[in-house]
Amino acid sequence: MTQLEEARKGVVTEEMKFIAEREGIDAEKLRRNVAKGYTVIFRNVRHDWVKPVAVGAGVRVKVNANIGTSRDIVDVKAEIEKAKVAVKYGADTIMDLSTGGDLDEIRKTIMHAVDVPVGTVPIYQAAEEMLAKGKAIIEMSEEDMWRAVEKHFKDGVDYTTIHVGVTKEVVEKMKRTKRAVGMVSRGGTFLAAWILHWGEENPFYKDYDYLLELAREYDVVLSLGDGLRPGGLPDAGDELQIAELYTLGRLVRRAREAGVQTMVEGPGHVPIDQIAAQVKLAKVATDNAPFYVLGPIVTDIFPGYDHITAAIGGAIAALNGADFLCYVTPAEHLGLPDVEHVRQGVIAAKIAAHAVNLTRFEADFKKDYLMALARGKLNWARQFELSMDKERFVEIRKERPTKTEACSMCGDLCAIKLINDMLAGERK
């Protein structure tokens, strides 16, 4: 029985109790949101060692970090380090997007390296296995696709991106629609190309009920992928994106009827003034399903800094209802990220998430309140304790030392020290 089914029966599961205690929220309220499908819980029944995480209404905005090998760079040790660094700096979940090497072994190794939920995109494996055989991606059969999905579910992944909304109808529409960037979703493109080649319907859409059966068996959260998300600002909010969104909304309702947990993925690249409207539209179209966004990236002309462009968009999206932020690293659009890129990406996304969480949770705001008090007293030891990135705190303090109580920016001209000294004198 899934978390959704248990919640509908009025049962507060052990996972709900764990999450409620961790987040400092009421377990019964969490149960009600899970029962409605407004909140999902990541915890595959076979992933015994995972610490469950909730995404959606009434809980904190969460951050995901993507890692994984590529066909050009297969370094499993590096990916394990990335996973551990991501978790260290605050990633709530990890997605293994590996496309090179022994994908089964890599996935299992990553899952055992961390205790957070792990997500995947199974069709990547189906596509990679075709290339490994010297075949074209479009030669994969429906059986190949389903085999990959079931393998990932059995291995214990907690959520999977399935591009169910890339239908034959929307692919036909794509032929008549001009886009600046085209399709940028790998999984979505694999399916679109397959549909164009064979003239057949997307197997995951055609046999959606079977997908629901599999997901229900393992209580895997289906992350309904946005295969037609905008890959550049000019494409934001176009006909293809919105058509897919409404398809996903219908599929969310079918999943809920089947007792399967679902969330919906969103853009992408979106001008800053459109983000609020896009998030609110998605929430309406999907009946308040948890919304998982990649960024959104708010400008396309700063490659090397897309962790920042994404954090800006992510904060606005989260403030307007997005529940789950997929980090973006400085390497986005340029190459496979290294460990340092992962660290920077996680921190940027955590800043965006925390900026919103502190407006909703007293415990989160208290951290900032305590930091303000510490700064007001020039209490550097306390500021260090409260810092989210302690290594960076120490690094900059050592690089730019001062002989004063203040920092090397102001030294004896420190505003805080001056006014504190003057007020102390007045009190005497």
Swiss-Prot record:
It catalyses: 5-amino-1-(5-phospho-beta-D-ribosyl)imidazole + S-adenosyl-L-methionine = 4-amino-2-methyl-5-(phosphooxymethyl)pyrimidine + CO + 5'-deoxyadenosine + formate + L-methionine + 3 H(+). GO terms for biological process: thiamine biosynthetic process; thiamine diphosphate biosynthetic process. One of its GO terms (molecular function) is carbon-carbon lyase activity. Catalyzes the synthesis of the hydroxymethylpyrimidine phosphate (HMP-P) moiety of thiamine from aminoimidazole ribotide (AIR) in a radical S-adenosyl-L-methionine (SAM)-dependent reaction. Its EC number is 4.1.99.17. [4Fe-4S] cluster binds at residues 407, 410, 414. This is Phosphomethylpyrimidine synthase. Its cofactor is [4Fe-4S] cluster. Zn(2+) binds at residues 269, 333. The gene is thiC. Binds 1 [4Fe-4S] cluster per subunit. The cluster is coordinated with 3 cysteines and an exchangeable S-adenosyl-L-methionine. Substrate binds at residues 66, 95, 124, 163, 185-187, 226-229, 265, 292.
